[in-house]
Amino acid sequence: MAAAGDRGGREAACGHDSYRSPLASRYASPEMCFLFSDKYKFRTWRQLWLWLAEAEQTLGLPITDEQIQEMKSNLDNIDFRMAAEEEKQLRHDVMAHVHTFAHCCPKAASIIHLGATSCYVGDNTDLIILRNAFDLLLPKLARVISRLADFAKEQADLPTLGFTHFQPAQLTTVGKRCCLWIQDLCMDLQNLKRVRDELRFRGVKGTTGTQASFLQLFEGDDQKVEQLDKMVTEKAGFKRAFIITGQTYTRKVDIEVLSVLASLGASVHKICTDIRLLANLKEMEEPFEKQQIGSSAMPYKRNPMRSERCCSLARHLMALVMDPLQTASVQWFERTLDDSANRRICLAEAFLTADTVLNTLQNISEGLVVYPKVIERRVQQELPFMATENIIMAMVKAGGNRQDCREKIRVLSQQAAAVVKQEGGDNDLIERIQADAYFSPIHSQLDHLLDPSSFTGRASQQVQRFLEEEVCPLLKPYESVMKVKAELRL
């Protein structure tokens, strides 16, 4: 993100005659876009130069209050056109902005960037942005979990057909299935928080991480160099800085960051794929606006476009983790510049993509529609087959022979299956059992034996316990931001 490069005035290109990433122009929230903007980045560079100067002054370097005040007064006075022209000539973005800052701070010009290297502003700014980007994502993820938790609680007892291999399996409940989604997202919330809290500042380290330039500034005073590093780290709001760096902070950090975002992408993709499949089965739908058009040619269509968008972007988010993996592996010795162009793209895109999928998933989770009658019909189509073992056990209790009963059930089941598969009819296994005198001892028990709630096990209790013991405590730190609604740009 921050290293030598050439914008050459391209930031002025806008409108409809130049490419812009759809992540910024179409999808991501304004607050996340601002965090990765040039304005935020270069303003943070200036803030870092100010913090460095303040700390150096405190530790005895000849820096005046007037110079400090001049820097403070010009933090937002950024001449982007001048910076672009400087970079065009110098082919170095940091020095271009040193000159631009110095131009509006003539008294402080001599002490701007004193003792520092490009990565002092570049890498430290990246770390500040990464931390702040996590701070934007975490409440959004918490809100998604909260909305889905409300949905799971509401649907905790509604029996639905479970699927393994996307083939009918035993019953579960709509709420229990939702808890599978929530559990993955809870793991993501914990992982994002962990990586955010473990971020360390690069600090004040010099060109190859040895702090040689600062040791020279302070005339060999080790303690003052240590104090300088600590003071700037604290000003930036970090608890710790790396003790060891090359010119850059280790690019393993970027792997950690994008790995947890990619893992979030996998969770979102699974959830939204399930919703898309359920929409096809007509059991559940995402919100669909009154004026929304599903197809230009088929007016009856209600396509799950929000879930499809999430899946589309989640694939991109998962793929991005390959960039920092490759980058970290080819950083020769103290650093090479082939990390720079790649990181300008992948770090921003990862957070803008994660931001978009969370905004969209919150919107989906706030308006999920369930169709109980459709669910009930599908359950009734499969339940007779599931109930055969219970029917056999009831017959044995009534005095029947298990083997004889099993054979009769097998024959009747095959006949019923033929009606479903070959004739397209409904499952009539229960009608066949009711018509067979052999099963007369249990005819009065059939309704009880076919009660769907008796096939869902402890699903309802599991939902309640999971929400109370795991989800609610995890969401407690985010209570104050739970009421925020998701706004989709498109």
Curated annotation (Swiss-Prot):
Highest taxon in the source lineage: Eukaryota
PROSITE patterns: FUMARATE_LYASES
Keyword Acetylation: yes
Endpoints of the signal sequence: none
Molecular function GO labels: (S)-2-(5-amino-1-(5-phospho-D-ribosyl)imidazole-4-carboxamido) succinate lyase (fumarate-forming) activity; N6-(1,2-dicarboxyethyl)AMP AMP-lyase (fumarate-forming) activity
InterPro entries on file: AdenyloSucc_lyase_C, Fumarate_lyase_CS, Fumarate_lyase_fam, Fumarate_lyase_N, L-Aspartase-like, Pur_lyase
Catalyzed reactions: N(6)-(1,2-dicarboxyethyl)-AMP = fumarate + AMP; (2S)-2-[5-amino-1-(5-phospho-beta-D-ribosyl)imidazole-4-carboxamido]succinate = 5-amino-1-(5-phospho-beta-D-ribosyl)imidazole-4-carboxamide + fumarate
PTM sites of type N-acetylalanine: A2
Binding site for substrate: R26, Y27, R91, H92, D93, T117, S118, Q247, R309, R335, S340, R344
Enzyme Commission (EC) number: 4.3.2.2
Pathway it works in: Purine metabolism; AMP biosynthesis via de novo pathway; AMP from IMP: step 2/2; Purine metabolism; IMP biosynthesis via de novo pathway; 5-amino-1-(5-phospho-D-ribosyl)imidazole-4-carboxamide from 5-amino-1-(5-phospho-D-ribosyl)imidazole-4-carboxylate: step 2/2
Pfam hit, one: Lyase_1
GO cellular component: cytosol
SUPFAM superfamilies per the UniProt record, alphabetical: L-aspartase-like
UniProt enzyme class: lyase
Gene3D superfamilies reported in the protein's UniProt record: 1.10.275.60, Fumarase/aspartase (C-terminal domain), Fumarase/aspartase (Central domain)
Family under the similarity heading: Belongs to the lyase 1 family. Adenylosuccinate lyase subfamily.
NCBIfam families on file: purB
Function statement: Catalyzes two non-sequential steps in de novo AMP synthesis: converts (S)-2-(5-amino-1-(5-phospho-D-ribosyl)imidazole-4-carboxamido)succinate (SAICAR) to fumarate plus 5-amino-1-(5-phospho-D-ribosyl)imidazole-4-carboxamide, and thereby also contributes to de novo IMP synthesis, and converts succinyladenosine monophosphate (SAMP) to AMP and fumarate.
Protein name, per record: Adenylosuccinate lyase
Protein source organism: Bos taurus (Bovine)
Gene label: ADSL
